[in-house]
Curated annotation (Swiss-Prot):
Chief place where the protein resides: nucleus
Protein name: Interleukin enhancer-binding factor 2 homolog
Record's compositionally biased regions (Acidic residues): 366-387
Subunit structure of this chain's protein: Forms heterodimers with ILF3.
């Protein structure tokens, strides 16, 4: 070819300063998403009426939302604990566990709690190194102060690997312990809480702050609650973490050219369509974590097998949804988990579940590995004797 002339040695990029031989840069692909390129697919017939689907979505959200009594009890307990910790920050007195600040995080802070799971999360950032003794001392101090304020209320306190939790008769507040970032370099695994636990609590603060700034739109919150529900009812979606669901819900509602929130029925269908198209498969651009540096794609926390499972589960449910099976998917007609494993019929149309595409590579036996290593060593020795 004419363009090859004058290259000299070293191929197209030359021998100096070119690409490393054999190196292929990772270029993630973008899965098909109709709502990003809607202009390229003009409608040939009017959209079908989805009033009934929208009403079912709202009804399901209402069923999943915490009851007024649940909301009142969790609000009361969170407020009391928050006030006690705030007082310890302002006036610690003789109490030696120094606290930097306390922050509300998780579904309580985001407004995406579900009925029957009356648990709120607080993160307490310590100024000191987080020893197990300090965590227990803080837990005991908080619960003793609460009992002094209201002796009639029955409270329990349990320490755990992330901090401690305080429970009343019908509400629980988990206190996640972390420390100021400079202390993370001074940790001793035998004395202090696990660094992964501390980093996870700091990440929860970043997540709550991002959500408040970017995803506080009511449609996003309702969609996330519905996604949490579908994750519980279909085992194939179990690998999706709460943070992945938050980002997926936000993306489905807001990530399109007009930047105006999509209607709930459209966003719900879009979630399943994006998952079915391979949004969280290897090589996909996925969703980049807005709270981490280095273009971290959130779905890479899942194994390859889990990524495939999420995809084929969504593919089956998209087909069921397109043939009017939304009541089953939403859980309004009993258990529907069988849909992803058994054939189902919708108005004469048979939907066959998608099958897994990923197969685990065969595990090599230890004997084979040893034989391989011995073979390599023998080859090395023969090469040395030849030299």
């Amino acid at each position: 070819m004419r363009g090859d002339r004058g290259r000299g040695r070293g191929g197209r990029f030359g021998s100096r300063g070119g690409l490393v031989q054999g190196y292929r840069p990772f270029v993630p692909h973008i899965p098909f998403d109709f709502y990003v390129c809607e202009m390229a697919f003009p409608r040939v017939k009017p959209a079908s009426d989805e009033t009934a689907f929208s009403e079912c979505l709202l009804k399901r959200n209402q069923d999943l939302s915490p009851t007024p009594s649940e909301q009142a009890s969790i609000l009361s307990l969170v407020t009391k604990i928050n006030n006690v910790i705030d007082n310890l920050i302002v006036a610690p007195g003789n109490f030696e566990v120094q606290i930097e600040e306390v922050r509300q995080v998780g579904s309580y802070k985001k407004g995406t709690m579900t009925a029957g799971h009356n648990v709120a999360d607080l993160v307490v950032i310590l100024k000191i190194l987080p020893t197990l003794e300090a965590v227990a001392a803080l837990g005991n101090k908080v619960v003793e102060t609460l009992r002094t304020q209201d002796p009639s209320e029955v409270l329990s306190m349990l320490t755990n690997e992330t901090g401690f939790e305080i429970s009343s008769a019908d509400a629980t507040v988990k206190i996640l312990i972390t420390t100021v970032p400079p202390n993370l370099r001074k940790l001793d695994p035998e004395l202090h809480l696990d660094i992964k636990v501390l980093q996870s609590a700091l990440a929860a603060i970043r997540h709550a702050r991002w959500f408040e700034e970017n995803a506080s739109q009511s449609t996003v919150k309702v969609l996330i609650r519905l996604l949490k529900d579908i994750r519980v009812r279909f085992p194939g979606f179990e690998p999706l973490t709460p943070w992945i669901l938050d980002l997926l819900g936000h993306s489905a509602v807001m990530n399109h050219p007009s930047r105006q929130p999509l209607p709930l029925n459209v966003a719900y269908r879009r979630c399943l369509q994006m998952l079915a198209a391979g949004l969280f498969l290897p090589g996909s651009v996925g969703i980049t974590d807005p709270c981490e540096s280095g273009n971290f794609r959130v779905h890479t926390v899942m194994t390859l097998e889990q990524q495939d499972m999420v995809c084929f589960t969504a593919q089956t449910l998209v087909r069921v949804l397109s043939h009017g099976g939304y009541r089953k998917i939403l859980g309004l007609e009993g258990d529907a988990s069988y849909l992803t494993t058994e054939m189902s019929t919708w108005d004469g149309v048979i939907v066959t579940p998608s099958e897994k595409a990923y197969e685990k590579p065969p595990e090599r036996k230890e004997e084979e590995d040893e034989a391989l290593e011995e073979g390599v060593e023998a080859e090395d020795e023969s090469m040395e004797t030849q030299e």
